[in-house]
A protein has these predicted regions:
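Conserved hydrophobic "DFG−1" position in protein kinase catalytic cores
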Residues: 17-18, 66, 76-77, 122-123
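Catalytic-loop of the protein kinase fold
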Residues: 107-123
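ATP-binding glycine-rich loop module of kinase domains
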Residues: 2-53
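Short hydrophobic-acidic sequence motifs that mark active-site Asp/Glu residues
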Residues: 17, 24-28, 61, 74, ...
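Conserved structural core of kinase catalytic domains
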Residues: 41-97
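C-lobe/activation-segment region of protein kinase-like
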Residues: 124-206
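Conserved hydrophobic core/spine positions of the Hanks-type protein kinase catalytic domain
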Residues: 100-104
Length: 206
């Protein structure tokens, strides 16, 4: 039986666990959405597939698999739960491994840009971290001021999650960065842009 991983929305994908040949897979698909959302979803799937190809073989990144259609992206399901559910409080070892994972992602030139969302962080059955949902990511293989700024946004999002789930683990430096990140987030346009498009799709599809 398929298990939904995300609340269904008319303008968003279906995300659920499926089973194929005794293997649990995570499938994100727009195939059942209205035409306009389906076409936008096709572009998002193509982009996210490209990003996953840049992160191949990094522990904590789901393995990308062949998908049945251009509206769908399929990966290995990493198990466990996402941090939104708070089934288990992440400990210091978890966050240390998570920091190493984020650094590995950045070293490949990928910036996630939605690290404030606890649903994008996972904890597998062995307590190890993983990261999903790269649809809003950017790929900047070269260094420079823009990449440093966007990486800093990722780290601020990570610290916000850490502060929410286990604030006692924050160092003094991390606490100061968290406060600064909360202030700067008021100026960060990307979440507002996403909300704008969501409301736009809702109006169009009513």
């Amino acid at each position: 039986m398929d298990i939904a991983l995300k609340k269904k929305r008319l303008y968003g994908p279906d995300v659920h666990v499926i089973h194929r040949e005794d293997r649990a897979l995570a499938e994100k698909t727009y195939r059942r959405r209205p035409w306009l959302v389906r076409m936008a979803g096709r572009l998002l799937v193509r982009w996210e597939t490209y990003i996953y190809s840049k992160l191949r073989d990094i522990p904590g990144i789901p393995e990308l698999l062949t998908s049945p259609d251009p509206y769908t992206i399929t990966t290995v399901f990493m198990g466990g739960h996402n941090l939104k559910k708070r089934l288990k409080t992440p400990d210091e070892a978890y966050f240390e491994r998570l920091e190493a994972l984020i650094k590995a992602i950045h070293d490949r030139g990928v910036i996630h840009l939605d690290m404030r969302n606890r649903r994008n962080y996972g904890m597998d059955d062995n307590g190890n971290p993983y990261i999903v949902d790269f649809a809003s990511s950017v790929y900047l293989p070269l260094g420079g001021a823009l990449k440093r700024m966007l990486c800093a946004i990722d780290w601020m999002g990570y610290l916000k999650v850490k502060a929410y789930l286990n604030p006692d683990l924050l160092s003094d430096t991390e606490s100061k960065k968290t406060e600064m990140g909360n202030t700067l987030s008021l100026l960060w346009f990307f979440p507002r842009l996403l909300r704008f498009f969501r409301h736009l799709f809702q109006r169009i599809l009513r």
